[in-house]
Amino acid sequence: MTQVAKKILVTCALPYANGSIHLGHMLEHIQADVWVRYQRMRGHEVNFICADDAHGTPIMLKAQQLGITPEQMIGEMSQEHQTDFAGFNISYDNYHSTHSEENRQLSELIYSRLKENGFIKNRTISQLYDPEKGMFLPDRFVKGTCPKCKSPDQYGDNCEVCGATYSPTELIEPKSVVSGATPVMRDSEHFFFDLPSFSEMLQAWTRSGALQEQVANKMQEWFESGLQQWDISRDAPYFGFEIPNAPGKYFYVWLDAPIGYMGSFKNLCDKRGDSVSFDKYWKKDSTAELYHFIGKDIVYFHSLFWPAMLEGSNFRKPTNLFVHGYVTVNGAKMSKSRGTFIKASTWLNHFDADSLRYYYTAKLSSRIDDIDLNLEDFVQRVNADIVNKVVNLASRNAGFINKRFDGVLASELADPQLYKTFTDAAEVIGEAWESREFGKAIREIMALADLANRYVDEQAPWVVAKQEGRDADLQAICSMGINLFRVLMTYLKPVLPKLTERAEAFLNTELTWDGIQQPLLGHKVNPFKALYNRIDMKQVEALVEASKEEVKATAAPVTGPLADDPIQETITFDDFAKVDLRVALIENAEFVEGSDKLLRLTLDLGGEKRNVFSGIRSAYPDPQALIGRHTIMVANLAPRKMRFGISEGMVMAAGPGGKDIFLLSPDAGAKPGHQVK
């Protein structure tokens, strides 16, 4: 199927520059890379770009904690991110940063055009302010209950449960993430992007049929609830770009983050000395195609704000958004305690990149479904598909070709019809890659692999090799097997770049999509070397354990009271249940003659009196002040004979000791003798 060459620009969502890349990130970058590699195989001109999202208060505060500048932190993080993506063979043409001169200029240009066109509004707003830290709180530094779906523990700008966006002031019971304080309201002038002005355009875009059905349906819900003006400014202190002619005001990170796609491409064009391509891809009437691969948590920003910003500043809109779901591990959310919150670099210390690329690809479709990385299934599938079906097809035939025929393949196909079955599948498999129905493509390829192995099983070259006068048959059978292997690896080339390199070295030819129409006949292959090793659960166990150890190593140091007085070893509930805690009324309190630490307390347990000696004298120099208070005592502690008498229990107190001892008291309404449960 001949295709007209297209110009395509592909992006992935920009990773935030305050943390490492993990397997959740890798789903998107692998999905996009497989699609990009397929497009390149079909002869299209593809520019594949990304960048670090490097602005915002979280980066500013983390840099402060580390004692370095934000610029130093994002520089180090960029190197780490690029190393991880290179390790997974993500074929970016350029990886940049939103903290760049290109991005600053483009952000100011888009803002100025929006302002000139009347889409920027100014007004004074009441904003959440942390009274303890003395700063306005960014959206992500306020948490509370979502005002839409009532889910707790949601950020101040959007809900990760229902996807809604809102103002931090709309949160129910907000708290400052920085200090834990309840924020107060303060006035500040802010700049707003007039999103409602683009409602008609956005609805037409939604109805165009290009967007995934789930995305279009979600957008329709947002239209029905009404679009709101979008706050695009933040107050100092803030790490980002200052808004022109507005001292102390900065672009909100979500304004300049998507512009980072443009900034990265501009940087690529400048590196190439190409002053023309930027406009060819981004001008209003561009015929190039623009695709954003993103997660479902940022659909709102990419489907509403971003196309509206582009429309309002006279740039082209995306051709489409390709949205994916989240990654779970072993059926549950990634967990640091269980060792399933796995960093990309940790994975590469235990497995190759192709294995994860294959597993994710086999599970992906064009729908926005979550993907479960079941580690046991991962091992089984990689061994069954890559090793047993594909690589084994080459290994079981290559030995005979190398040893008996000096690596030269037969001059004719043993089964031309079977070969045609394989090459005819190119259209179905190609369409599956094109439409991002990756799981379907893998199923089609593995069905062909089963056919190929069945052919070899039926022809039994190991038997033919022992029969005199059948050398030509042996060469033809094994050459057929190697040619089928070549077709399979061509179809898998977008998924398995490193295995493809080894396969191409063995086959002594480059694997191209159109090349499979001509089988390798009379062609000399190289000596066969192991192409891929089996994996096992011991590697998985080591991976999980390593992830747990990383969490321990990077855990925040314990501060406060726990640093000096750590929590004791865990006890069972049965152990705890043996302790009988009761409310007691302090009827009398007095000094103990001969002791500078003890007070003698007379306690009423609601019908029973107890005499207790307690080492709280330094904290309560006036024992009479304790009379009439309620406290908590251990009622079933064995009596202890002391020099001053018998102590018949223990009262509960908190604090490190000395003057810092605080007698515990129950809430109002508790009566002497009540059990504490």
UniProtKB/Swiss-Prot annotation:
Q: Which UniProt keywords apply?
A: Aminoacyl-tRNA synthetase, ATP-binding, Cytoplasm, Ligase, Metal-binding, Nucleotide-binding, Protein biosynthesis, RNA-binding, tRNA-binding, Zinc
Position of motif 'KMSKS' region? 333-337
What this chain does, per the entry, is described as:
Is required not only for elongation of protein synthesis but also for the initiation of all mRNA translation through initiator tRNA(fMet) aminoacylation.
Gene3D superfamilies, from UniProt?
HUPs, Isoleucyl-tRNA Synthetase, Domain 1, Methionyl-tRNA synthetase, Zn-domain, Nucleic acid-binding proteins
Reaction(s) the record says it catalyses? tRNA(Met) + L-methionine + ATP = L-methionyl-tRNA(Met) + AMP + diphosphate
GO cellular component, as recorded: cytosol
| Named cofactor requirement(s) | Zn(2+)
Compartments in which it is found: Cytoplasm
HAMAP family referenced in this protein's UniProt entry, alphabetically:
Met_tRNA_synth_type1
Transmembrane segments annotated in the record for this chain: none
Question: Which family does this protein fall into?
Answer: Belongs to the class-I aminoacyl-tRNA synthetase family. MetG type 1 subfamily.
Protein name according to UniProt = Methionine--tRNA ligase
List the CDD domains. Answer: Anticodon_Ia_Met, MetRS_core, tRNA_bind_EcMetRS_like
One of the Pfam families matching this protein, by short name: tRNA-synt_1g
Relay the cofactor remark from the entry.
Answer: Binds 1 zinc ion per subunit.
Q: How does it assemble?
A: Homodimer.
Which GO biological process categories is it annotated with?
methionyl-tRNA aminoacylation
What NCBIfam families does the database record attribute to this sequence? metG, metG_C_term, PRK00133.1
Concerning InterPro entries, the annotation shows:
aa-tRNA-synth_I_CS, Anticodon_Met, Met-tRNA-synth_bsu_C, Met-tRNA_ligase_1, Met-tRNA_synth, Methionyl/Leucyl_tRNA_Synth, MetRS_core, MetRS_Zn
Keyword ATP-binding listed? The answer is yes
The GO molecular function terms of this record are: ATP binding; metal ion binding; methionine-tRNA ligase activity; tRNA binding
The UniProt record lists the tRNA-binding domain at 575-677
Residue sites binding ATP per the record: K336
Q: Which residues bind Zn(2+)?
A: C146, C149, C159, C162
